[in-house]
Structures are given as structure tokens and as C-alpha cells.
UniProtKB/Swiss-Prot annotation:
Function: A GTPase-activating protein (GAP) that modifies Der/EngA GTPase function. May play a role in ribosome biogenesis.
Presence of the UniProt keyword Glycoprotein in the record: no
Organism: Haemophilus influenzae (strain PittEE)
Gene Ontology biological process terms from the UniProt entry: ribosome biogenesis
Similarity-based family: Belongs to the YihI family.
Protein's UniProt name: Der GTPase-activating protein YihI
Biased composition (Basic and acidic residues): 62-77
Domain of life: Bacteria
Amino acid sequence: MARKKKTRRITDIMPIRKADKKIDITKARSGKKLTRYELDAKAREDKKKRKHKGLASGSRHSAVEEKANKLQNEIKDPKIGSKKKIPLVVEFVNKPEKGQVIPVIKQVKKQDPMKELENLENNEILNELLDALDAGKTISKSDQQFVDECLDRISELMEELGIEDEDESEDDLYRTFERMDINQFR
């Protein structure tokens, strides 16, 4: 049977001494004087801290690793640099520079002149404004401008389509009245 080397570790079998217990100094009684055991534990912790003042063993080898770690940390810093990929070859393929964009001219679909004329003649707003003018009422400048634009467009469309405005004179109306047979309406 092989021999076992004796250790001084504290195990479950051995009773725990008060001196071996780690006493949390912050948990120690607040406002009261520390006990002898607590003072001893505190002194031991202070001594351990004082004992390791110098550099760690093998510091000349670990210093190189720290520098490498610092370089990696600098590269990983998200605040520095951009993640956007930059092309190494400049390509200009029919792409205008910013600020030199040619505006696209929107082509307005022209409506059939006959339909446009019909829409203008059936425009309720225009008819109401014309009725107000015939009644002798005054209308605002914007309404008057709208009426003028619509009437000008109507006259342009009538010329384009070859339709003549039949302005009947009073003489023509009088002649038609004379020719009419009144007995027809009884």
C-alpha cells in the first residue's frame, strides 16, 4: 500500500478553528469594538497585501502580452474607425456626384381636348362663380383669377377643336321669335 503524504488542509473531518475562519470585516459588528479574532484576521489580510508589493514573477514575459492585448483593445474600440468598407478602386459608371443631380422633368399627361372642355364646362365651382358674377355679386381676387384662367382655357380648347362660340345677336333672336308659330305650344 502506497504512503499518503500528510497535508495541512482543513477538511470536513477536522474541526474549524476560529483563527482559520475568514471573517468579513465589513460584516463585523458595526459601531462596536472588534474582537481579538477579527483584529487578527484583519492584520493577516493587511500583511498579505504588504507582502506582494513587487512585480509578479515572469513580468518581463507577460509585459509583451499586455502590449498585444492593448493593441487588440484599441482595434476593438467601437468609437474609433468606421465599419463601412472602402473600395480600393474608384469606379465612376454614369453616377453623378452629389449636388450635381439632374432633376427629372415630370411629363403631364395631356387629356383629350374634348374631355377637358367637357370637364371645364361641367365644373360646379366655375358655374357657381359665373352665376354669382351674373347676379352682380363681387368675388375675391383668387376666385376671379380662377374664373379667368378657366374661361381662357375653354376658349383655347374651342379654337383647337374648331368650335365657334355662337354669339346670337338680338336681331337673330327677334327674327326667330317672329317666325315661330305660337299655336305649336298650346
